């Protein structure tokens, strides 16, 4: 039987942006954009695991530097402009649950393109989600 782990945050950061090349690692006030999302998730009082799903070894290296777990490099079929976030998040969660024989109770999907989101915003959203017993928020 799998042991229950609470909340996982999956940060989705694909390298092949068509509009703004490598937008997820562009510097904002001296830090790569994805660092802000990793930091907020790591500082959250509600999130137990912070995982970066990326197709880029460079993004993985940067993500690891800021404290994200990098359990895999995202498969190419999930790293196209036509890939859907639910498929990417499902891949990440299933990969970890199967590898570690654990089960997450809740999943938080985060994108690096919201750098002004702070840990307390995440905690407020998670509290609202749990209190109202919603399916999603």
Predicted regions and their residues:
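N-terminal nucleotide-binding beta1-loop-alpha1 segment
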Residues: 1-21
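Hydrophobic/aromatic residues located in beta-strands of well-ordered beta-sheets
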Residues: 9, 50-52, 136
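Short, well-formed alpha-helical segments that are part of the catalytic scaffolds
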Residues: 20-43
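Conserved donor-nucleotide/metal-binding helix-loop-beta segment in metal-dependent transferases, i.e.
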Residues: 85-87, 92, 96, 118-137
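Short aromatic/hydrophobic "clamp" motif used to bind/position activated sugar donors
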Residues: 107
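Catalytic metal- and UDP-sugar-binding loop of GT-A-like glycosyltransferases, i.e.
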Residues: 110
């Amino acid at each position: 039987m799998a042991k229950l782990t609470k909340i996982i945050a999956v940060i989705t950061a694909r390298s092949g942006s068509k509009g703004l090349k490598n937008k997820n690692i562009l510097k904002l006030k001296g830090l790569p954009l994805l660092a802000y999302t990793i930091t907020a998730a790591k500082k959250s009082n509600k999130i137990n695991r912070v995982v970066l799903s990326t197709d880029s070894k460079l993004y993985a290296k940067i993500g690891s530097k800021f404290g994200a777990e990098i359990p895999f490099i995202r498969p190419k079929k999930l790293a196209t402009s036509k890939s859907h976030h639910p498929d990417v998040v499902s891949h990440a969660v299933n990969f970890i649950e199967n590898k570690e024989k654990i089960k997450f109770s809740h999943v938080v999907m985060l994108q690096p393109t919201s750098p002004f989101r702070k840990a307390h915003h995440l905690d407020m959203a998670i509290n609202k989600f749990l209190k109202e017993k919603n399916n999603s928020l």
